């Protein structure tokens, strides 16, 4: 029973705790009511106003009748209201994955404050041996135990063995990677698939770290440089090649990680300041097949002249070469065996990529994805610093002879003749769409495939030409021999959202009406999966033109009234489904009711009409979902030819795009005394507007959109069916204000990095904002294995075979702008012991009488 004795010994502290909690509840209620009133005014939910008034009323009642339980009854009504409202909204969103996080954020702070207040009141107003006290203690203990049980049940764990025979029947050919991995995507087809199956679903639980390598290159020389190597190692012959954020190249022993040689191009620091991230996604490998006993190069074409340059210093003809591109505009040829510069390439071993570019600042345009080797050519695109100026450096793509370094062709949206040489003093057209990602090629078709970005200013295009719009956010097929355009497919018409092509095009065969055709699949930031005929660009699966919003169009700009949508495959830009996700107030989230309400206010103030909401100069801007990260990005897609599955990881993270009239933009662009790291507003010079486009985060530095913020999904390429999808990543290494929660509960984080698919029935991936590498069963999505990484794994996973053993490798160097832990590691895994099957998955037979060695 509740005592009327106000001076019961030892109870005063509980009384003060009760009053303190009710005071906090009152402050919380005041904030909720104030924000809630504004939300109602803006056309949103009444919940925050109603709950806030209840909490304020209960707090005032506690001050007036502090010895009575009536305030707790009012608080209890607020809790019940919150619970009902939460379930109604969460159910209205169809119980999205990670809905438990949504529920916890809605209820958590209110329940904790009310619970502590109620506990303190009971201990204040009841005798020491009261049954009410015992009941309260029991309830608290039971609640904590239940919470711990729920956390334990939802703790991410690998399930171990999936099936007795993990290897799938491979339909692979030499088009897929085997013991070697000679390109970013395994081969120039970009499948990120390996025929190796020694590691499979039946034994992946036994995968252990075999070795790791530290380059020492993880501390930028300046604070204005953002490191993220994003490197996928290349395996060719008996060497593994990797490069770092500052473009140091290392050749390693594939079995031990021992450094066989290293090369430091000594990149000037000022050339890295203009980069979004200082990255070296891959080196390029070329083998001209001239050396006796060496394999032929992947990609010699008879119609490309094979002219060998002068013999380089070092006693070798550089028949096998590794190429690295640097931010200061050098394409350097290195002997793959010895690591010295191949002097017969270009000028003393170097091709000057700044030639014809008219750069105003070092690094303004540079290659960060590596060259693609095909047809005896090195095909080189480049990133151009986003949103600096309309007359930014050209987006030209150039092809050089891999032996001599001679320029063979140069493709640009505004240069129809790719064979034309520049006149003395002439430069390539400024501001044209660039190709910053990994280029694919199919030598059987004689084509290279370019995924393009935008012209010099992403979010206003009133002064773009029709040709620039045609080749923006497009897949362009060019002739390998001449560089001439064969076909182009625009994925976003008149792109004003920075939905450039990030993912590498993927090539494979499909059967259409009983006829096998070479297809190209392109994943986009907007979430579409387009399947095109690789020879003609014709859509092989339905693509329809959907009407898109036109209201709020910026003066002088032009928008397309429709946008292409792939309707055969699910959209992978938000919650996976047949159409792009549309959010409303129910999807807005916060760690507490206060930041959640603030995010709701922002949502209702901003323009949002779904995908392709036009950029606006409205005071609060517009919500961009998917954001500039995507959707699908530079990690690329994985393709399993046996199971006919495309594996895609993607982010679900919104940005705010706020256009600023030129008079309000003080920042200077790169090339005119400006520096990208110093810009709060991207200047967009040469247009009427600057642009601010931060991620949409709350005051706790977490997204204003309820999780999941990242997924991995498998789609059948023949039927279009979404086979499985699941959130990718936990909150273990992230949290409010960037403080790790150490909760390994799947919520789905933003992710950058590529999958690896193997004929062992496995999909390996890191990419998420927690520092883990994972292996999923490709057929089902079940998590079978995971391992902790020493830093962020924002890179592509690869695999290779060496001396009878399969290895799985991931670069763990983190991503400065993604706020994952930085490092300098390459981590390599393999099966332990001598019982491993051979590289194709068959168990290795021991000789009769063979003995196990060691313990």
PLM regions with names:
Residues 111-143:
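Cytosolic-side transmembrane helix boundary signature
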Residues 130-158, 637:
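Internal/C-terminal transmembrane anchor helices
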Residues 60-74:
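Membrane-helix interface "capping/anchor" motifs
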Residues 181-185, 225-248, 274-330, 363-389, ...:
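Repeat-blade elements of multi-bladed beta-propeller folds
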Residues 2-28:
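Cytosolic juxtamembrane helix and N-cap/initiation of the first transmembrane helix
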